[in-house]
Amino acid sequence: MAIIKCKPTSAGRRHVVKVVNTDLHKGKPFAGLLAKKSKSGGRNNTGRITVRHVGGGHKQHYRIIDFKRIKDGIPAKVERLEYDPNRTANIALVLYADGERRYILAAKGMQAGDKIQSGIDAEIKVGNALPLRNIPVGSVVHAVEMKPGKGAQIARSAGTYVQVVARDGEYATLRLRSGEMRKVPVDCRATMGEVGNAEHMLRQLGKAGAKRWRGVRPTVRGVAMNPIDHPHGGGEGRTSGGRHPVSPWGVPTKGYKTRSNKRTDKYIVRRRNKK
């Protein structure tokens, strides 16, 4: 994997930093694992904007990823690594011994030809998926379930991982990258190793158009709006907003806690680190 800093041959190239992975498949994705993905433009069924800064962008197919890893006892071989426009991580196309193909997240160090497996009898090695009760304390894992059988929800982005720090009774304690310590049932599955493509964070798009290709629209400052559009809007001439920063709906935007899921508070042993 190479990091390329473009020469300033134009204003649009001056700040571009690319991450080039020569191991990725250059052809089309596996057609049997593609699904239609339609654009919403950030609108809901009534046509109102519910998510700002969304719209446009290149057409995409959704890749159906196996986040459950429940084909126990059937060995599989990694056929190739592929780019996925729907996530920061790369994905791997695996061929099981029974002839079925599936996409999974590509772990760090995974290559074409690697053998992987899932289940309680799987070996402790990168790419294998096991229940947390069978994973040694201190191990680094990714794609962790929060409920048994629901599918992976934690540590799915490029370069992320979770460490198993303890196991007590029916719960395992995990340390997340944010610093949060969280309890998860030991029957939840996780995949050994880190998510690959950690260099993703080093890339620089370099120009506004590269954001538009990805379906991201501009962000307008509140102080540049009218009073009807934002609490910071209006005023004669340039203003600083006149109050502590808030969202367009008046919610404080710097350091204000908005978590309200009391049902799962008991599973959080320690809150995440302050930025």
Curated annotation (Swiss-Prot):
Repeat is among the record's keywords: no
Region listing for Disordered, in residue ranges: 223-275
Xref: Pfam families: Ribosomal_L2, Ribosomal_L2_C
One GO cellular component term: large ribosomal subunit
PROSITE patterns: RIBOSOMAL_L2
A GO molecular-function annotation: rRNA binding
Biological process terms in GO annotation: cytoplasmic translation
Family matches, as InterPro entries: NA-bd_OB-fold, Rib_uL2_dom2, Ribosomal_uL2, Ribosomal_uL2_bac/org-type, Ribosomal_uL2_C, Ribosomal_uL2_CS, Ribosomal_uL2_dom3, Ribosomal_uL2_RNA-bd_dom
Keywords, sorted A to Z: Ribonucleoprotein, Ribosomal protein, RNA-binding, rRNA-binding
Oligomeric and partner information: Part of the 50S ribosomal subunit. Forms a bridge to the 30S subunit in the 70S ribosome.
Family statement: Belongs to the universal ribosomal protein uL2 family.
NCBIfam families referenced in this protein's UniProt entry, alphabetically: rplB_bact
Role: One of the primary rRNA binding proteins. Required for association of the 30S and 50S subunits to form the 70S ribosome, for tRNA binding and peptide bond formation. It has been suggested to have peptidyltransferase activity; this is somewhat controversial. Makes several contacts with the 16S rRNA in the 70S ribosome.
Protein name, entry field: Large ribosomal subunit protein uL2
Organism of provenance: Shewanella woodyi (strain ATCC 51908 / MS32)
